[in-house]
Amino acid sequence: MIQQAIAKVLEGEDLTRAEAASVMTEIADGGATPAQSGAFLAALRMKGETVDEIAGAADVMRQRADRVRVDRDVFIDTCGTGGDGRHTFNISTTAAFVAAGAGVCVAKHGNRAVSSRSGSADVLAALGVNVDADKETVERCIEEVGIGFLFAVRLHPAFKAIAGVRRELGVRTIFNLLGPLANPAGARHQVLGVYEARWVPVLGGVLAALGAAHAFVVHGEGLDEIAVTGMTHVCEVRDGQVERYTIRPEDLGLPRRDAAELVGGDAAANARIVTDVLEGQAGGPRDAVLANAAAALVCAGAAKDLRDGVARAARSIDSGAAREKLRQLVAATTVPA
């Protein structure tokens, strides 16, 4: 199948959802050579990935994931694509703790760094979380603490083989978009940041096709986050309906911030910023977290709108609830000596 798919894509023709799924299955099963996999990914990138192609690939990633059981009707993910190249601190990871502190169940999917020096797994490890905890521990964390970390590299074993091909290609491919679409717990409520604004409507269409209950796809001022530095492009998906709009910090009751305030560093430096935010320190990092946590609360049904979400997120931080969720997650994932 992959040879025919390469030929079709090189002619500029789009694949159907089923065809894309067949190719991804072949890659996952080891039926495609590294050369074929690389050619397919590069050809698809040159043509431009469509909603159906991304949805078909995501179908297979979801099917092949090592499933994490969550016994809740509503739980969220705040996983973005990464790769925006702006080297901010880990905003969406911090927002996950704030959402959890506000009473929302979180199954946080993430990985090591893509373009920054600190991905969600890196900063969580620096904060003391055992990101390599086994699946049973992760499930227990979600159930008892209300937040758990789903480490992508451990829970998507079928796609380990493609990592080398992606590394050798050295360019973004469909896999850069797939991670946030393949939460191993099957989260249907999520905030998904994308590294370029052009992907906002595309990923919105994909989430609608995949059956998202309530989700936000966002890109703000070059970031795969809701921006407090300027305008954010939003695609809100709700039970198959897709709405596009833009928001500014002022719409959320937040001041406009300078991008330099949000720049992070390595995992240790970012862990200090996360800690400062969770301890209530005012400033740009806090406001960025409030904006993104607000969207998480809205998609979970825990806030009526983004302004209300900001207020509830602020209470989660200022009451100490968000910080306590981090402490509990560290304790729950740490193996006793």
Swiss-Prot record:
Binding site for anthranilate 2: R166
Gene3D superfamilies named in the record: Nucleoside phosphorylase/phosphoribosyltransferase catalytic domain, Transferase, Pyrimidine Nucleoside Phosphorylase, Chain C
Residues reported to bind 5-phospho-alpha-D-ribose 1-diphosphate: 80, 83-84, 88, 90-93, 108-116, 120
GO molecular function: anthranilate phosphoribosyltransferase activity; magnesium ion binding
Broad EC category: transferase
Co-factor remark: Binds 2 magnesium ions per monomer.
Chain residues that bind Mg(2+) 1: S92, E225
Residues that bind anthranilate 1: G80, N111
Essential cofactor(s): Mg(2+)
Biological process according to GO: L-tryptophan biosynthetic process
Residues annotated for Mg(2+) 2 binding in this entry: D224, E225
Pathway linked to the protein: Amino-acid biosynthesis; L-tryptophan biosynthesis; L-tryptophan from chorismate: step 2/5
Reactions this protein catalyses: N-(5-phospho-beta-D-ribosyl)anthranilate + diphosphate = 5-phospho-alpha-D-ribose 1-diphosphate + anthranilate
UniProt EC number: 2.4.2.18
Cellular component terms (Gene Ontology): cytosol
Keywords of this entry: Amino-acid biosynthesis, Aromatic amino acid biosynthesis, Glycosyltransferase, Magnesium, Metal-binding, Transferase, Tryptophan biosynthesis
Pfam families, alphabetized: Glycos_trans_3N, Glycos_transf_3
The protein's role, per its UniProt record: Catalyzes the transfer of the phosphoribosyl group of 5-phosphorylribose-1-pyrophosphate (PRPP) to anthranilate to yield N-(5'-phosphoribosyl)-anthranilate (PRA).
Subunit structure comment from the entry: Homodimer.
HAMAP family: TrpD (MF_00211)
Family classification: Belongs to the anthranilate phosphoribosyltransferase family.
Protein name: Anthranilate phosphoribosyltransferase
